Amino acid sequence: MLTEAAHWLEQNYDAEPFFRVVESFDPHEPWFVPEWYRRQYDDNESHEQVISSYRDVRDISPAVLRRSRANYSGLVTMCDRWFGHLYATLAALGKLDDTLVIVTSDHGHSIGDRNYMGKRGYPSAPEVYDVPVLIRHPRGIGAGTRCDLLVQHQDIAATILELAGVPAPQPLDGHPFWRRAVEERKPLRDHVTVAWGSAITVIDERWWLNIKVNGKGAFLHDLSAPNAFETNLTDRHPEVVQNLFQKGVADAHGKFPPYILEMAEQQADAPGCSALVPRV
């Protein structure tokens, strides 16, 4: 996909202005990666593992876990190489001086983090939820700047429109964050809510609450504490749980659909890209 995007740029080098979205999909399971990339991280001859097991890794052999991590890392390296090709094509065509480049992802993946392999919405974890947003301004504005604003994916569209000087054709759910991140260094919002199947995660500057939509089974973590996700502070701070949960309910316009509430009662966790898939 990245090479096709580079080819498109060459074919449309004189297109002005242009907007191009490139969905590489990788690095994503199944982790089919050329052997030469995988061998940079695991050179052993062992059982192949390209599918995430969605289970506790303490029941998985060290060799399988090592191979899973190697295949994932190999895919990251492969994508890095071909994104470099796309970036070099922009440079060769003289596009970098007037083109905004944004790199992000929709989610991450646990490969042994917190003894789990997979991605899930309950319990939630930062290696799945906390994704990077990298922005290169054509004039180098803000180069090297890092920030920890509470930003969500819908904010990216609003930011693109603002930087391009294009008025939004209709009200947007997102908020432009460029100036907050680079110039003002002010918070964009006081919390974010992420919904995944039958659970929500509400995050503010200090707290991370993961809770089912029926208000049960809360996990509360203090982000200011070392090893924050090793301790569930729900019983110590019930008022924080209630406050954040109510913010999440408000973000859902005050209520959840009955079938989601029913699912929250029935399911112990929420694995996979969607907790809405039927259990076998």
Regions found by a protein language model. Give the residues of each.
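Catalytic domains that recognize anionic headgroups
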Residues: M1-V280
